[in-house]
Every structure is written in structure tokens, then in C-alpha cells.
């Protein structure tokens, strides 16, 4: 009888553990403290990627650009900066600019954006989107010279403080084949080390098939390399797709946990979550074929504070995770305030850091 009881307990615990993986995996967002916000009065702040450094402190790499240029200047005047905190959720304090402009002649010489930081084999790797262009900024308009020159980059350092070694070529460039799904531009890299030791990257690609300067379709693609520095072999099979929805997803963040790969993805219209603009959770057995988890809604664009207030937002996106001891402990997001007649074109942005359970 005692043996049967022990077996029953083991089965119950095992089933509970299994229910938290694969298609049943869940992340639970906790209430947010006011100190878990990072912003600047003079800069748009966007998309923070955290990591615990070898100094015991927490390091945040994020995009910023001066507000005087307008929000759409993310594509012309963004730079990647670095902030530091004693606590994983903050408060973070600005430390330095990681990638200042270095000239039009470089593929990433005019703009760096949307960083994601990782620690592989004793070194820090900072992946990002870079571009060059005509340097012509018109407030409220997207500069397509810069937008369509976006490529994927990586820099490497021995310390979270740098110095960072940048490269004269992208880590992944657009495909030479004009019919390829990433023939026009690429952006927003996300990377994880695979079960076999290789490196899986997922990125946004834009094709040249659609007429007009915007191009399209916009899709997400995989690439795999033996080294964090590449070369990456592309798998030109679109993922996170929905029939009759030309651009359903953006900003995936991927990681390996246990025997599954997971991704947090911005769901533009609720094609996956059925809750409109939201963040959705996906899983994969091999990192290439992806499906939404059961109950895939992670959050809608709003923040629930510890003081009981709820802030509704225009955007809540660019998910990045703090992963410690192999498990996600905090979710970092870029937030854009709602706009109305009083702040049209001038709404604030900030990064918010949310504990996970």
C-alpha cells in the first residue's frame, strides 16, 4: 500500500512537470513595481535586453534616440546604450553608449537598434540591427533609405563593459536571389544555443515580391551556425505564419529550456491569441517548426502595477528575457504610451521589467 502511494505521488509530480512544458508551457507575469521602469526625459527608450555580468551586476542593453527627431527616427538616429543595476528589475542607471555612429561607409555606421545580448563560451555577444542611408530625417516619416538597408550584426566582448569588437560586414546579409524572402532587408535577430551546441537565429526578412518601396511579404526565417559569429546557413522557410495574414507576427525572442524551444512573439492582430494586439507564446521541438502553446496569450498591451493601477498602452513589445540557471526570471518589454490630442506624436516610451513566476 505504501509503495502504491509513493508511485502515485511520483506520477502526480511527473504529470505536473510535464504539463508545464511543450504545448502546455506557461509564463506568469507578476505585478510591477514603479522602480522597474527605465526611461529618459530626452530620449525615446526602447527594447532592453538584460544579462547578469561577471561582476555580479545586471546589465541592460537598449535602443535610444533623441526625442527632438520624433519617434520614427528609430530608423535613422537610434544608438545602442548600456545601463547597470544591482537588482535584476532595476532601477537601472545609464552607463555608456555602446555603438555610436561611425560613418555612412559602414553597413551599420548610421544606426544601431534592437539589441539582444547573450553569453556563450566565456564571451558576451551583442546581436543587433544596423543600417546606413542618406541621413535625411523628417519628423513623423519613416526613412526608407535606412529602413531598406537594415542588416543583422554582432559584436563580441570579454566584459559587459566592453570594449566591443564590431565587424565590417553583417553576420547575416540579404539573399542575393531577388526572389528570396529576405532579398530586400532583415531585422530583429534572436538567438539561442541549440541542443547539439549549434546556434539558432530567427530574424525578420522582407522580400522584393510586393510592389512599392515597402516591399514584402514580411516573414520570419531561421538560420543555423556552428559559431556565434557565423557563418549562418539560412533556412528560407517562413515561420509564425497564418493563412491570409501577410504580416501576423514580429519581434520573436527565442530560448531553449529543457527539451523544447520557446518563443515570445508579438501578435499584431490576434491571429494566434484572438485578443487583438498582444504577445503570444510558441514552442518547437527542433527550433524550426513552431506552434502556439495551448492558451498562448501572454499579455495584452497593458501594465498591472503593485499599487493596483493598470496602464493601457499603444504598444507593449520587443520581448527579452532575463534567464538565470536555465529558466526565465523576468520579462523586459518596450512600452509606448497611448496617444490622444494632447500628446499626438510626442507620447513617451519606456522599458518595463516584469518578474515571472
Where are these regions (language model features)?
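Bacterial Sec-dependent N-terminal signal peptides
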Residues: 1-22
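Carbohydrate-active catalytic/glycan-binding domains of CAZyme proteins
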Residues: 19-357
Amino acid at each position: 500500500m505504501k509503495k502504491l502511494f509513493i508511485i502515485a505521488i511520483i506520477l502526480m509530480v511527473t504529470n505536473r512537470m510535464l504539463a508545464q512544458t511543450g504545448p502546455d508551457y506557461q509564463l506568469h507575469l507578476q505585478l510591477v513595481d514603479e522602480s522597474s521602469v527605465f526611461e529618459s526625459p530626452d530620449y525615446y527608450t526602447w527594447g532592453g535586453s538584460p544579462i547578469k555580468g561577471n561582476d555580479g551586476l545586471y546589465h541592460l542593453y537598449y535602443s535610444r534616440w533623441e526625442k527632438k527627431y520624433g519617434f520614427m527616427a528609430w530608423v535613422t538616429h537610434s544608438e545602442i546604450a548600456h545601463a547597470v543595476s544591482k537588482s535584476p528589475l532595476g532601477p537601472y542607471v545609464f552607463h555608456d553608449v555602446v555603438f555610436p555612429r561611425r560613418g555612412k561607409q559602414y553597413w551599420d555606421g548610421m544606426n544601431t537598434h534592437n539589441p539582444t545580448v547573450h553569453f556563450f563560451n566565456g564571451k558576451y555577444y551583442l546581436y543587433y540591427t544596423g543600417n546606413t542611408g542618406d541621413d535625411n530625417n523628417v519628423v513623423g516619416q519613416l526613412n526608407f533609405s535606412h529602413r531598406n538597408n537594415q542588416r543583422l550584426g554582432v559584436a563580441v566582448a570579454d566584459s559587459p563593459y566592453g570594449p566591443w569588437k564590431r565587424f565590417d560586414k553583417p553576420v547575416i546579409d540579404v539573399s542575393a536571389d531577388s526572389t528570396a524572402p529576405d532579398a530586400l532587408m532583415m531585422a530583429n535577430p534572436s538567438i539561442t544555443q541549440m541542443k547539439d551546441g549549434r546556434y539558432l537565429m530567427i530574424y525578420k526578412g522582407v522580400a522584393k515580391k510586393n510592389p512599392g518601396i515597402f516591399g514584402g511579404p514580411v516573414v520570419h526565417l531561421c538560420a543555423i551556425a556552428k559559431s556565434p559569429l557565423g557563418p549562418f546557413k539560412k533556412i528560407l522557410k517562413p515561420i509564425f505564419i497564418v493563412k491570409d495574414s501577410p504580416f501576423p507576427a514580429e519581434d520573436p525572442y527565442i530560448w531553449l529550456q529543457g527539451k523544447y524551444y520557446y518563443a515570445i512573439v508579438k501578435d499584431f492582430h490576434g491571429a494566434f491569441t484572438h485578443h487583438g494586439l498582444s504577445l503570444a507564446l510558441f514552442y518547437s521541438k527542433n527550433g524550426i517548426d513552431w506552434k502556439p502553446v495551448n492558451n498562448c496569450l501572454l499579455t495584452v498591451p497593458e501594465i498591472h502595477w503593485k499599487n493596483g493601477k493598470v496602464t493601457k498602452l499603444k504598444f507593449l513589445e520587443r520581448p527579452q528575457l532575463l534567464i538565470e540557471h536555465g529558466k526565465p526570471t523576468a520579462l523586459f518589454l518596450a512600452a509606448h504610451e497611448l496617444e490622444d490630442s494632447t500628446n499626438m506624436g510626442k507620447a513617451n516610451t519606456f522599458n518595463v521589467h516584469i518578474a515571472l513566476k
